[in-house]
Design a protein with these regions (language model features):
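Acidic donor-binding helix in nucleotide-sugar-dependent glycosyltransferases
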Residues: 64, 71, 184-185, 200-203, ...
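Hydrophobic packing residues within well-ordered alpha-helices of enzyme cores
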Residues: 68, 111-113, 174, 198, ...
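Carrier-protein-dependent adenylate-forming modules in NRPS/ANL systems
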Residues: 1-165, 178-179, 208
Length: 249
């Protein structure tokens, strides 16, 4: 029985260690390398003494953001990822609600204005897995995985809490319903702070597939996106109807 989403990664690493997991522009990362980097980040997070605490991620859609998400999950804490272009005032409102114990961000995004401990993405490569710390982490399926912030009916940030179990059950349902296999090549359109991205990310990891990340800028050129899908042999997309209509027209 799966108790946390990191077990999806562990199982796929055992089967497909050298297979490409994520592709972003000219950058790509294998299952084994991704597991190593996210475990190393988890170890660094654990050095802060955090357990089941909120961690705020302020990063653009990237492989580094995914390492941050899985690193937080592996450490037994839970994350909230937000738009890196969000105005300072709104970020502060989210911080006041979430009360993060740690922020993971990039140095050029100005998050050092917040009086909260930081980990910067350019430090990831310097971290090493600490098996002693990692072995002490205990996660059950009802533990929180992430908090998704929406505008809410009043325009004020509203956090929606999602457990490991919710994502595990959803991922199993998607995999079975759409017969997703390890030979699938998916493309992610939704930002990571939208719940549509959950299908792309965790279904890919669970099934041993490959996920390509496309930026908002790239989606402004439909002809180039279609050519990208052809060139890379994409077999599965999960896009909202408005995007599909946009491409059809």
């Amino acid at each position: 029985m799966i108790s946390n989403i990191y077990e999806f990664l562990d199982k796929s690493v055992a089967k497909y260690p050298n297979k490409t997991l994520f592709v972003s522009g000219k950058n790509c990362i294998s299952y084994l390398e991704f597991s190593h980097k996210s475990s190393a980040l988890a170890s660094k997070i654990l050095e802060f003494g955090l357990n089941k605490k909120p961690v705020l991620i302020i990063l653009p859609k990237s492989i580094e953001a995914l390492i941050a998400m899985f690193g937080v999950a592996r450490s037994g804490n839970f994350y909230s990822i937000i738009d890196e272009k969000m105005p300072f005032e709104r970020v502060q409102k989210i911080i006041n609600i979430l009360k993060p114990a740690l922020i993971i961000t990039a140095r050029d995004l100005g998050a050092n204005n917040y009086d909260i401990p930081m980990i910067y993405s350019d430090e990831f490569d310097s971290f090493k897995p600490n098996l002693s710390l990692l072995s002490r982490v205990e996660i059950i399926d009802t533990d929180l995985l992430y908090v998704l912030f929406t505008s809410g009916s009043t325009g004020e940030p509203k956090g929606v809490s999602i457990s490991h179990k919710s994502v595990i059950d959803y991922t199993f349902w998607v995999s079975k319903t759409f017969d997703v296999g390890s030979d699938e090549i998916l493309v992610n359109q939704a930002p990571f702070y939208f719940d549509n991205s959950i299908l792309d990310i965790f279904t890919t990891v669970r099934c041993g597939a490959t996920l390509h990340l496309l930026s908002t800028f790239e989606f402004a050129f439909p002809a180039k996106v279609v050519e990208y899908l052809k060139t890379h042999g994409v077999t599965m997309i999960f896009w909202v109807p408005s995007v599909l209509i946009y491409f059809a027209n």
